[in-house]
Structures are given as C-alpha cells and as structure tokens.
Amino acid sequence: MGSFSIWHWLIVLAVVLLLFGRGKIPELMGDVAKGIKNFKQGMSDEDAKDDARDSGRTIDAKADETVNDVKKTTKS
C-alpha cells in the first residue's frame, strides 16, 4: 500500500507530459547538460589559473645543514 505501482508512475508521467509538452522536456535536459559543461569548463579554467600563478613562484632558500654534513661532523 505504501509503495508506488506502475499505474501511479504512468499517471505522473502523463501529467508531466501535459504540463511541459513533448518538446519542452528535451529542451530542459539540454539546458541541464549545458550547465554541467559550463561548470566543468569553469572549474578547469580556475585550475589553469592556479597552476599559472604557482609556476611563477620560486623559493630561494638554502638548507643550513644536510644529513651528510651532520654525519661528517659527528665522525670527526
């Protein structure tokens, strides 16, 4: 009694088709696909901008002591 039968789903489908029409549903799905495509493109554009910003950075630093230097000083 609590679950939907096939007749419930057919009635819902008929109401949706009456409200939106046959041509409107594919148009809506196309709009959803375009939105997803634009979202993915926007995300990849942001990643490219982040990579470009990070590639320009350099770190000029020198280690004070390395492992080899420590071994040399402890053996002497």
From Swiss-Prot:
Keyword Cell membrane found: yes
GO biological process: protein transport by the Tat complex
Annotated disulfide bonds: none
Lineage: Bacteria, Pseudomonadati, Pseudomonadota, Alphaproteobacteria, Hyphomicrobiales
Listed InterPro entries: TatA/B/E (IPR003369), TatA/E (IPR006312)
Region (Disordered): 43-76
Membrane-spanning parts: 1-21
Protein name (Swiss-Prot/TrEMBL): Sec-independent protein translocase protein TatA
GO function terms (MF aspect): protein transmembrane transporter activity
Topology within the bilayer: Single-pass membrane protein
Gene: tatA
PANTHER family for the chain: SEC-INDEPENDENT PROTEIN TRANSLOCASE PROTEIN TATA
